Amino acid sequence: MSVKKSHGALKASAIIALGGGFPQYEGDVDLSEIGQWIRSESIDHKLDNITFFLVHQTCQEKLGGSQVALRLETHLRGGDPYCRKPFFSFVEKMMGYLNQSCAHVQIGGDVYRIEL
């Protein structure tokens, strides 16, 4: 994971692909908030406090096809009120709406897969 330090906070560039024609979001992740879930990944790859887990993919593949990137952050920015909820709850809702069991996440040079 490519990580940089900014004003005492660890940040990394991240992209999440859900698909379904959502507008693109990408940018830095504040690892002091989101990264703690990634860093606390257990031996069976399950994460605490969320209902899906991340599976690390060693292959350096690009996110493509019809997938659209969403910014990985605690709350999504934007004028739409339904977007102002915890990020992972939003991801889970959208994945359910799109009938998708997984989405791809790119953090730095690493690609992860989110599975419900």
Regions found by a protein language model. Give the residues of each.
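Short, flexible N-terminal segments of the mature chain
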Residues: 23-50
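Short, extreme N-terminal segment that most often corresponds to the first beta-strand
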Residues: 1-28
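Short, compact, well-ordered microdomains
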Residues: 72-115
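Short secondary-structure capping micro-motifs at structural edges
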Residues: 1-4, 56-58, 90-91
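A structural detector for beta-sheet-dominated domains
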Residues: 15-19, 55, 73, 106-108
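Short, intrinsically disordered low-complexity segments
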Residues: 42-81
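A compositionally biased, intrinsically disordered/low-complexity signal enriched
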Residues: 12-16, 34, 38, 90
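Hydrophobic beta-strand segments of well-ordered beta-sheets in folded domains
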Residues: 12-14, 68-70, 103
